[in-house]
Every structure is written in structure tokens, then in C-alpha cells.
Amino acid sequence: MKRLLCPFALLYDGVTRLRNTLFDKGWLTEHTFPIPIICVGNLAVGGTGKTPHVEMIVGWLLEAGFRTAILSRGYGRKTKGFRQLSEKDTAEEVGDEPLQMFRRFQHRTFISAVCEDRVKGIKQLIVDHPNLDVIVLDDAYQHRYVKPGRRILLTEYDRPFDRDFLLPMGRLRESARGAQRADVVIVTKCPSALSETERDQYIARLQSRPDQPVFFSTIDYAALPAVEDAALITGIANPSPLLHHLKAKGIKVEHLSFPDHHRFSTSDRDEILQLAERHAVVLTTEKDAVRLELLQLPEHLKTKIYVLTIATRLLFDETATLRENLIEYVRTNSSSCSVD
């Protein structure tokens, strides 16, 4: 099958390479702004753990006292254009991941907005909030019309960009050469017991630049309910790490799996109700929980739902290194902003 897809991947490579060349040569304009901008993204489609890494970075910035905004595209929403999130918004209006992040930080000095045009979105944020210190761009590595001050590239430990193929043969949005634009690379979803030798071998294989630090992160799961079996509902790109975690904890699950960002339908609701009747506990992710709200499930089922929260953590005691790098960048470059 991959041989059949090879011509299409070569065509895709030609298009993306031409586009990147136009930006590299200055024939297409990368916009700069009078405010620190940190871009978090990946070369592959889905499944790198982007949302918890954005949350980790935003948490650091807020703890440092910076007035921080997240700007996302709002994938899967029904609305268009710029929209600042509020407590009344639903996943249908702003997207599941932006709503998840907004709820995690909504009681702090924090702004969250969505806009498919990142240049327009940044300008609007600066106009509406001229005292902002920093904007974090969520999933914007290929959005080259914006030139951020820090580009953070994520790649999954078990599916790194150097061992993947371009769409449609593989999962890459652009070739592995695009990794050279990154200021920082984070290898995500690593085994928590990763050794320093394994780390060094991995870094050598990625062939990163001498001035391009590579960090390694793992997932920390919150406490689980004391049950031996449960239902599990997911609509995420790669549920395998979660399934492995539940199995390791001795929980047998009946898994109802949907595609990433899936918009639940009436027939899905019926299937979920039937599943819930067979189990005392229904497990789901934070991202799925905000979309499940739209189904208006009965109260007796809502009491069964247990939302699995996660956080990401850097290995090898390197949290302070990356955190201070980003804080120093924002502190050095932050000022009051204005847009013509």
C-alpha cells in the first residue's frame, strides 16, 4: 500500500518544500509582533501530547507572574473567526482542546482565544489586551505567517519524525527537515525509566543542531478509582498509552473508541448509555469530557463518569532548564503592545 501512496507523498513533499522555501527566502512574509510569542507544535498529525505540554508551559508563565494568552485554531468548532473563550462556551463553539485548557486556567490571569488566522488572532489579542506579556500559539508549527520568538517542536518517543513518512504514506505534515526551525525539541510520552544512555542515543539519532536542546517528557496520571473493571470512552488520536496505563494498574476496560475530535451523535449517545449500564464507572479523558457534555446525558450516568487527568513532566531533572529559558525570553522581550 505504501508503494501506491509514494507518488502522492512525493507530490506533497514538493508542495511543502516550495512553501517553506518561499518563507525562508522572504518571498512570503513571516509577521513579527511587539510581544513574546511561543509556538508549540509538531511535524506529525495528532497524538504527540501537545495539550498537556502547552498546559505545562502556560503554568510556568502564570506562576512567573506573566499575563498570558493561548491562541488556538479551534479545530472542530462550528464557529468562524476570532473568539475569546468564556465560561459559557461549549466544545462545539470553540473546540475541545481550547475549552479544556481554558477551564484548567480560567480562575487565573489568563486569556484564551481561537482564530484560524493566527496573524489576525494575535493582532486582536494585542488590541483587546494591550498589557499582555506573552502569547502561546497552540499547534502552529506549520503556520509560518507568524514568526515566533521560540519554536518548541514535539515528537512522540515511539513514533519520532525521523522514522516517519510524509502524508499520505505516513503522518508527517512536512518533511523531517522542518525540525531544523525549532529552538527546542521535546520527545514526548517517554518511558519514565528512560536511561541517560538511551537518551543520548536518541539525541544522536535525531541529528539536532548543537544549539538546539532536546528534552524528554513523560506522562503522569492522576489517581484512579478503586475498581477492577470500567468502561472507557475516548476520542483521541492515540489511546494506546492510556490503555497500557490502565492495564498496568489492573483495571480491565471495555473500550469505546472514536476518532480524534469526534463529534458525538445521537447514535453514539445510545451506545454510550448501553455501555454505561454494564459498568459502575465510566472513564474518559479531559478532552472527551468537554464534548460529552453536549450529549446532555442523564444524571445517573453523569455520576458514573470519572475524568482521567494527566500532566506532563520533563525527565532528568531538566524542568528548571527549559522553564528558565522561556521565562528569561519573555522577561527580556515583554513590553506594552500596539498594533496599527
Question: Can you annotate each of these PLM segments?
Answer:
Residues 1-36, 329, 333, 337:
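A transmembrane-helix-recognition feature enriched in membrane-embedded lipid enzymes
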Residues 11, 51, 101, 138, ...:
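Residue-level signal for inorganic ion chemistry
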Residues 20-87, 192, 340:
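Walker A (P-loop) phosphate-binding motif
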Residues 69-71, 153, 229-233:
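Conserved beta-strand elements of the Class I
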Residues 74-212:
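Phosphate/Mg2+-binding loops and adjacent switch elements
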Residues 160-283, 335-340:
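C-terminal accessory "lid"/substrate-recognition subdomains
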Residues 259, 301-332:
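Short, flexible loop segments at boundaries between secondary-structure elements
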Residues 278-295:
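Phosphate-bearing ligand-interacting subdomains
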